[in-house]
Amino acid sequence: MANKVTLTATDGSTVEFYDEIKAQGGVKDVYFSVDKTYVVAFYRKAINANDKARINDIVNIHRNRIFTSDAVGQYWTAFFAWPTKIVEWKGLTGIVIPFYDKKFFFDGIDPSWPFIKNGQEKNGKWFSSAKLINKFVPVNQKGTFLSRLHMCLKIARAMRRLHAAGLAHSDLSYNNVLVDPLSGNACIIDCDGLVVPHKFPPEVVGTPGFIAPEVLATKALKVDNPKKNLPQISTDRHALAVLIYTFLLNRHPLDGGKVWDIDDPQKDDDMRYGSKALFIEHPTDKTNRVKADQLAKSQLPQGDPTKQPYTICGPYLKKLFDRAFIDGLHNPSVRPSAAEWEEALVKTCDLVQPCQNSGCEAQWYVFDNTTKPRCPFCGKEYTGQLPILNFYYAPSHGKFISENYRLMVYDLSLIHISEPTRPY
């Protein structure tokens, strides 16, 4: 039995945990509290005064501003695994983080399943690529297209709140979000590394595949070089767009068939995601189109954009994907904000309709504005009536202007219920 350790946090409260490492990250060792309501993560190496000051700001100043004691502040606690206390032990600094909600751990998996096991964290990576989700994730853990829309909505909403506080995550990726496609929930983790602009620079440049092209293009420059691009809110916006695209379509928007350097894989990756980054579904430049004949069976059909193009996500998301991966890929100032993604995802949720094929994995799809919509995932044509409400506003008496907002109404619609998909 491991020994119990009792410490006094910097805020004067008592922290108790067992002296046994339960998990290890890139820079921290994790211990479980005695009552298993929180974990204590200690930095493996002593941190400098600047890092201590940054963590103190995150734990105290920014936490108190976001997670206020009223209903609004409490609402946000489900969106972040935010550090709540700071402790010192054996010369090392540690942070106290609430234990992840049980919905972010796999449950209900058949013991004979050879890959994922019950109790494992639902790391976002499992649900990001066709190969992983098709080969390793059991059908009863995949969720539906609608629940994945809800999941992306939660991520966008969390990032909107973070950016509104003037903070940037700096390493937003599928590795730093926990997701639950079954309930449509998500939680941002690793919040101790947040960037406080103009005060605390980023610790890392990000995760490969999610690093903004302008950051990757100058990664070789020293930190004090004025030409070096560092993670900030605009680079978070790139990572958010990539994350939403991968969760909904199970492929990476920049992973096409073009090889930029045949001799050096690292240089090829740096060009693919950096200076030469090109959207695989670019409407006019076909240089980086996916070569379907080179895809593994486990990558299909999602890996082939000709089978499931990004337009199946509906008009609102299509417009933002264009801005993120065409207009804003190398022009950060025009990238969609987290608030814009949130709004587009809410509108898209209001435009979905149920698939009439009981065997369809997706179960839902976005109305395609035709009289005979067909599920893009299984091909089932919809039969029956399709009531669509178009919203207008009246700037003056007798004049009506479209709000660019439509609502699909069907017999199982829950529009009369206060849903968590609506902006708070």
Regions picked out by a protein language model, each given a short descriptive name:
Residues 159, 163-181:
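Catalytic-loop of the protein kinase fold
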Residues 178-218:
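Activation segment/activation loop of eukaryotic-type protein kinase catalytic domains
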Residues 81-147:
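Conserved structural core of kinase catalytic domains
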Residues 415-424:
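Single conserved hydrophobic/aromatic residue that forms the stacking wall/gate
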Residues 244-318:
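Conserved C-lobe activation region of Hanks-type protein kinase-like domains
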Residues 236:
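Conserved catalytic-loop aspartate of Hanks-type protein kinases
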Residues 2-51, 75-79, 88-89:
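ATP-binding glycine-rich phosphate-binding loop
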